[in-house]
């Protein structure tokens, strides 16, 4: 595995992802703890990705990082974010281009 840590969830997830795509890409989620701004887009990480929120909240606590959440409905992540953007379905592409 490309990352220095693993769990039963990540090991199984990475194995399935690699089987489907041929390779694992992306960044190490632990890098979020070193960020000044964490953007969580299109997922309710508070309720479904505890590992993501652990690193995001660590960045907030240790570095004063801001958390921005983007989704099409209000959820736990939007509620905990410093800035929560609730978009109409299909409009997030325009936001991505504008950023």
Please describe what each predicted stretch is:
Residues 1-98:
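Catalytic alpha/large subunits of respiratory electron-transfer oxidoreductases
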